[in-house]
Amino acid sequence: MKGGLGNLMKQAQQLQSNMEKAQEELANMEVTGQAGGGMVSIVMTGRYDCRRISIHSELWQEDKEMVEDLVAAAINDAVRQVETQSKEKMSSMTSGMLPPGFKLPL
C-alpha cells in the first residue's frame, strides 16, 4: 500500500510540474481572431491580453457601427481560440493520470 501511495504522490508532483509548464506556454502563445473575412484581426495572448488590432483601410469608409461589430466579433473569435487551445493543452497533460471518468474543471 505504501508503494502505491508514493507512486501516486510522484504522479501528482509530475502533474503539477506539467501543469505549470503548460500554463506558462499558454500564457506566451498568441492567437489571431478574425472577422469580416479577415478585414479585422486581433492578436491575443493566452492571458487574454490584446496585442494588436488590425483594421483594413477599406473599412474606414464604412459606417462606425459595422466596424465596431467586426472588432467585437474578432475579439470573441480570439477568446474562443484561446479557450480551445487551453482546454486541448490541459487535457493532453492530464490524460492517463486521472482516474477513469474524472475530469478537471477546465
Swiss-Prot record:
The keyword Membrane does not apply. InterPro entries: YbaB-like_sf, YbaB/EbfC. GO terms for cellular component: bacterial nucleoid; cytosol. It is found in: Cytoplasm, Nucleoid. One of its GO terms (molecular function) is DNA binding. Residues 10-20 have a biased composition (Polar residues). Its main location: cytoplasm. HAMAP family: DNA_YbaB_EbfC (MF_00274). Belongs to the YbaB/EbfC family. Homodimer. This is Nucleoid-associated protein Noc_2594. The lineage of its organism: Bacteria, Pseudomonadati, Pseudomonadota, Gammaproteobacteria, Chromatiales.
